Amino acid sequence: MTALTGDQIRQKFLDFYAAKGHTILPSASLIPDDPTVLLTIAGMLPFKPIFLGQEAPKVPRATTAQKCLRTNDIENVGRTARHHTFFEMLGNFSFGDYFKGEAIAWAWELMTTVYGLPPERLLVSVFENDDEAYDIWHRQVGLPKERIQRMGEESNFWTAGPTGPCGPCSEIYYDFYPEKGLANVDLDDDGRFIELYNLVFMELNQDDQGHRTPLKAKNIDTGMGLERMAQVLQGVPNNYETDLIFPIIEAAAQRAGIQYQKANASTQTSLKVIGDHTRAVVHLIADGVTASNVGRGYVLRRLIRRIVRHSRLLGINGLVTPDLAQVAIDLAANVYPNVRERQAVILSELQREEEQFLKTLDRGEKLLAEMLSPLKKAKGKKRSQPQLAGRDAFVLFDTYGFPLELTQEIAAEQGIGVDVAEFEACMAEQRQRSQAAHETIDVTVQEGIDSLGDQLHPTQFRGYEELSLTTTVTAILVAGHPATTATAGTEVQVILEATPFYAESGGQIGDRGYLASSDALVHIHDVQKQKELFVHYGKVERGSLKVGDRVSAQIDLSCRRRVQAHHTATHLLQAALKKLIDENISQAGSLVAFDRLRFDFNCPRPLTREELQQIEDQINAWISESHTTHTYIMALSEAKAKGAIAMFGEKYGEQVRVLDIPGVSMELCGGTHVHNTAEIGLFKIISESGVAAGIRRIEAIAGAAVRDYLQQRDSIVRELCDRFKAKPEEILDRISQLQADLKAQQKALEHLKAELALAKTQALLEQAKPVGNSHVLIASLAGVDPQGLKTAAEWLLNKLGSGAVVLATQPAADKVNLLVAASQDVVQRGVHAGQLVAALAQVCGGRGGGRPNFAQAGGSQPAKLAEALELAHSRLKEILES
């Protein structure tokens, strides 16, 4: 058995199967195409549509090294030898081509010949009823019967779900202790055995009754964990000490000033967590995920926060994730070049997220420590495990942004549980409070609709083809309650048999318009969808509307056209962002209204003015190119196969509506759109801003709304011209002159402040005291900003020649600024300004640091300032008089 690097193991696997006629395919993204799946959790996931018969295979045989990420066992990461979040799954796949005989024979050849594993260390399992696989292993491969175990359905039978393709599995295990013999072997003993290779034989189809029948086209799906194979071939005790992860662990240990091999168990666990999670966050960001509070973004945020938390447990202060990520990038770049291409994005996202979390962590840890203190004292007095109240955990989360998972982790370290049920109840109460005000009418309407029971049939929506139609009123609600009649002046909700009105969904607001009968006119100002019913919100303007009336339903054509322009422009905006900024950008929310559009998307940084202009220019170019739009109804699997963009978290039926702008954009969309991009006319970006961590927002206008916007801007320019008595082209110069005058006055004011600070500083010089062979000056200054503090320290140190200066100021009631400066000879005698100011800041409830000769810090407890300055005096005296 020859030791191989992780890269060599991966390449040998791919080369072996390529020689067996397999096409080597690149790893799919960690963001799967399937909008119902959060992350790519298995090597077979990219091929799932093929295995389910939804897509035809492009090749009969394939082999991959697939990036995967799972968080279901995140608490076990670092605590066991083999649990990971991020891992690589090596696999070979057959789509109706070869089957069990070849799959088993090749797997054995790979393990024993290519990787050189001793046959006497290998055992296999088969499904208890799979005689065919058993015979292949025994008779064709020649494996002794005592090395083949039949196992039950729970461990050795794979299903895609309640129905669909399924089949038995066969697994290859490595024995770390063959000297123990084969009597009473338990393959689940992970201290002795490690599962290396899993072969799935998809040969059956399961119906909704649980009956299984043979498949015509039988498939092979296999998986080998790269990290596990590396552990075996590199002869290390766990996956973390392989060359795939250990360099990250070593980098973290070096930052902490410790040696991994000499560290205790809890320290090693923290280092393993850091190593594992760092790989995960690098690949998540490289594949387009940004930190947020939902979905994949929350997975990323949680992993980053766990890295920071475990780094703090090791005593690592300051930013840590960018440095560790650089190690992970260097390890992966040769195989996954996108981590190098997106290196700047990865490091920037990690720095931003870590800096944000450190603010949360400091405050949250202090509050949590106060909450846990009485529980720790009571722990020995109670037989049951003490629990932190869920309401307290909720306060930490809701008020201070401290994650529940982190509260649980810190509490568990001290043997304390958390009442998660109460926490969830508090969350539910908060959601109800926040939604109650604007949901009252909707809830009442929903109750009114429910009370009508089966009297109502789903509304026929015909608004794609018809803008007006004659239909029947099937229900009327007044104040949310069913009614038979509504008279003039009454606010109503009307349900029709059929409607041309679009109901609000997918970010697009509902149509406006009117209903007219021989006796009534109803103005419709909103349309909402309740279950399968379209509820038209309006007001009876004249006459009397009755259930059973025949009415003419007419949408407001002007409003519909404005909405259509904004909706198609939204699709163009997403296409432009993907083309010009990052192909991994995806929608996080949207609003399509009559007067504007709003588009939220994942992006770790603000867009520049130049980028926004490029986006605007690209969209207007597409508009002027007069692209015809096409809508299609097709199967969801077909739409995904064609590359249509779906929004994660949306639930889609088997049949979906697709808007295609050939060569520009293809998205799943149920909204209304222009027939040709030229109908949009013009597109204008109004603003770009951040709405949450990792989420940016663009607000824009299109079509007639641009005309309104330009008229308004023209009015503003005319008003400025009148005020400045200037022509439009002269206004900027006038404003620049005003700014220059203001800047000159501010500069003069700063000069006066500096002179005042210098006068105060000169008076301080007399307070310097001799300590050892140097002078020490410790003082507090009033009315001086940090820059003034720095200027004063430099002047004083220059006058002292040899010595140390410690200055403090209190710029606000709850704020302290501290500064330590030292001459070079004093530094050589052992004074370190950065370490000293950190100690002083800690006394004042803050933090900071810096160079040996100069450092600044801040604190939040001015009452402790005198104590901090006394500490400075004693520390300097101790060093300089020794």
UniProtKB/Swiss-Prot annotation:
<dbReference type="InterPro" id="IPR009000">
    <property type="entry name" value="Transl_B-barrel_sf"/>
</dbReference>
<dbReference type="GO" id="GO:0008270">
    <property type="term" value="F:zinc ion binding"/>
</dbReference>
<dbReference type="Pfam" id="PF02272">
    <property type="entry name" value="DHHA1"/>
</dbReference>
<feature type="binding site">
    <location>
        <position position="571"/>
    </location>
    <ligand>
        <name>Zn(2+)</name>
    </ligand>
</feature>
<keyword id="KW-0030">Aminoacyl-tRNA synthetase</keyword>
<keyword id="KW-0067">ATP-binding</keyword>
<keyword id="KW-0547">Nucleotide-binding</keyword>
<dbReference type="InterPro" id="IPR018164">
    <property type="entry name" value="Ala-tRNA-synth_IIc_N"/>
</dbReference>
<dbReference type="GO" id="GO:0004813">
    <property type="term" value="F:alanine-tRNA ligase activity"/>
</dbReference>
<dbReference type="InterPro" id="IPR003156">
    <property type="entry name" value="DHHA1_dom"/>
</dbReference>
<keyword id="KW-0436">Ligase</keyword>
<dbReference type="InterPro" id="IPR045864">
    <property type="entry name" value="aa-tRNA-synth_II/BPL/LPL"/>
</dbReference>
<keyword id="KW-0862">Zinc</keyword>
<dbReference type="InterPro" id="IPR050058">
    <property type="entry name" value="Ala-tRNA_ligase"/>
</dbReference>
<feature type="binding site">
    <location>
        <position position="567"/>
    </location>
    <ligand>
        <name>Zn(2+)</name>
    </ligand>
</feature>
<protein>
    <recommendedName>
        <fullName>Alanine--tRNA ligase</fullName>
        <ecNumber>6.1.1.7</ecNumber>
    </recommendedName>
</protein>
<feature type="binding site">
    <location>
        <position position="673"/>
    </location>
    <ligand>
        <name>Zn(2+)</name>
    </ligand>
</feature>
<dbReference type="InterPro" id="IPR018165">
    <property type="entry name" value="Ala-tRNA-synth_IIc_core"/>
</dbReference>
<dbReference type="GO" id="GO:0005829">
    <property type="term" value="C:cytosol"/>
</dbReference>
<dbReference type="InterPro" id="IPR012947">
    <property type="entry name" value="tRNA_SAD"/>
</dbReference>
<dbReference type="InterPro" id="IPR018163">
    <property type="entry name" value="Thr/Ala-tRNA-synth_IIc_edit"/>
</dbReference>
<dbReference type="InterPro" id="IPR018162">
    <property type="entry name" value="Ala-tRNA-ligase_IIc_anticod-bd"/>
</dbReference>
<dbReference type="GO" id="GO:0005524">
    <property type="term" value="F:ATP binding"/>
</dbReference>
<dbReference type="GO" id="GO:0006419">
    <property type="term" value="P:alanyl-tRNA aminoacylation"/>
</dbReference>
<keyword id="KW-0648">Protein biosynthesis</keyword>
<comment type="similarity">
    <text>Belongs to the class-II aminoacyl-tRNA synthetase family.</text>
</comment>
<keyword id="KW-0963">Cytoplasm</keyword>
<dbReference type="Pfam" id="PF01411">
    <property type="entry name" value="tRNA-synt_2c"/>
</dbReference>
<feature type="binding site">
    <location>
        <position position="669"/>
    </location>
    <ligand>
        <name>Zn(2+)</name>
    </ligand>
</feature>
<dbReference type="InterPro" id="IPR023033">
    <property type="entry name" value="Ala_tRNA_ligase_euk/bac"/>
</dbReference>
<keyword id="KW-0694">RNA-binding</keyword>
<dbReference type="GO" id="GO:0002161">
    <property type="term" value="F:aminoacyl-tRNA deacylase activity"/>
</dbReference>
<dbReference type="Pfam" id="PF07973">
    <property type="entry name" value="tRNA_SAD"/>
</dbReference>
<dbReference type="InterPro" id="IPR002318">
    <property type="entry name" value="Ala-tRNA-lgiase_IIc"/>
</dbReference>
<keyword id="KW-0479">Metal-binding</keyword>
<comment type="function">
    <text>Catalyzes the attachment of alanine to tRNA(Ala) in a two-step reaction: alanine is first activated by ATP to form Ala-AMP and then transferred to the acceptor end of tRNA(Ala). Also edits incorrectly charged Ser-tRNA(Ala) and Gly-tRNA(Ala) via its editing domain.</text>
</comment>
<keyword id="KW-0820">tRNA-binding</keyword>
<dbReference type="GO" id="GO:0000049">
    <property type="term" value="F:tRNA binding"/>
</dbReference>
